Amino acid sequence: MNFIKRAFWNMKAKKGKTLLQLFVFTVICVFVLSGLAIQSAAQKSSELARQELGGSVTLQVDRQKQMEKQQDSGEKRSFESTPIKVSDANKLAALDHVKSYNYTTSASANAGNFDAIESSSSSDSSSSSSSSNAKNSQGGGQGGPQMVQADLSIEGVISTALVDDFSDGDSKITDGRAITKSDVGKKVTVINETLAEENDLSVGDSITIESATDEDTTVKLKIVGIYKTTSSGDDQAQNFSFLNPYNKLYTPYTATAALKGDDYKNTIDSAVYYMDDAKNMDTFVKAAKKTSIDFDTYTLNTNDQLYQQMVGPIENVASFSKNVVYLVSVAGAVILGLIVMMSIRERKYEMGVLMAIGEKRWKLIGQFLTEILIVAVIAIGLASVTGNLVANQLGNQLLSQQISSSTDSTQTASGQMPGGGGGMGGKMFGHSSSNVDVIDSLNVAVSMNDMLILGGIGILIAIIATLLPSISVLRLHPKTILTKQE
């Protein structure tokens, strides 16, 4: 009689204990498989989100270093305009992993042959302000401070589609077309719908804008598009017309540079490079550091807020499910080990008789191992049927809790920041993240790889749960076992 047959006969004779082992092993396998499936689903979702959203790297003036240099030289700290050469920005645009890029330059201006939308405070004080030229406002954006009152905010770009207001859906083209790369070098503009209606302007019309710092500098722009915005603008918009979102014009960056004067020709304020994959940002930065760009003056700021906001909860779920796999595997091995140990202790006499008639110890261990492996195979089969359902329910429940927790934390943090971080700056360099939806569901599906891993873990648990209790008993001499039994 071989040990495999004895294993089958023993399982049949002791159905109660066999069913108990099967139940415990099935529960272990279901939770392990659920954890593995959730990890796989979370990883796939994260990879898809990372590839879809990518990340951005912004080239701009290093204001901190600029201030430190002024302090070291004993100069009074002041804001210095330091534009970036387009030729330098183009060097980074040619590097690997750049999916798209946008150059931006900002300026303030006054309306020429049309009227800007007046803010409430500015309209009330228009008579007094016209008699005084000391209208203190910083309207130059990144181009520098301009101590004059301006009507309009001008943002020069390569493409409006890459501007956060448009990509987030806060603004959209309602007539005509957007600014594109083909418009670089042209004097065209996209204006707000309200501004167009107030001045009876339409696509194809031309407008004139004047520099807020030099009345002799004017730029004539052809309207190629009209957009609508849901943005409420800055809190100071009621005091300064140029902060009113209705008074914001988009032009090619070359047209805005022309408005700022000859010193700004072929320059920009910042460049935003959008990566093909967020994981490639560090590689891009390392490659950028090897170029001839002066990084004592400029700096590269990496931003993957969109990706982190979107996948933050799902990564927490993946981490939790990973811990579940570890804990359940260890706990399962311990519980099964105790059950097997109790079973082996009850079968001491059987083992003593078998060893007394010459049965080898390894065959006895083989019998116990065969019994638990048969249970393991059945348990893994049952887990494969029910694991997918459990994994979906468990994964989405955990994800829902993580999203709720993350939302509460975000609201608490934002409540400690009066004004939400303030105005125009939040959307200046591609750092907007307010309109990004987190991943709120997991498509959990048990894969063949998950089953193979489960099989490996199940067999390992079975071996550990069998060998450890067996060693303590099988080291005894047959005579000792039979004597104690009597």
Swiss-Prot record:
Residues 62-79 have a biased composition (Basic and acidic residues). The chain crosses the membrane at residues 18-38, 324-344, 365-385, 451-471. It comes from Bacillus subtilis (strain 168). This is Uncharacterized ABC transporter permease YclI. Its main location: membrane. Keywords: Cell membrane, Membrane, Transmembrane, Transmembrane helix, Transport. The gene is yclI. The lineage of its organism: Bacteria, Bacillati, Bacillota, Bacilli, Bacillales. GO terms for cellular component: plasma membrane. One of its GO terms (molecular function) is transmembrane transporter activity.
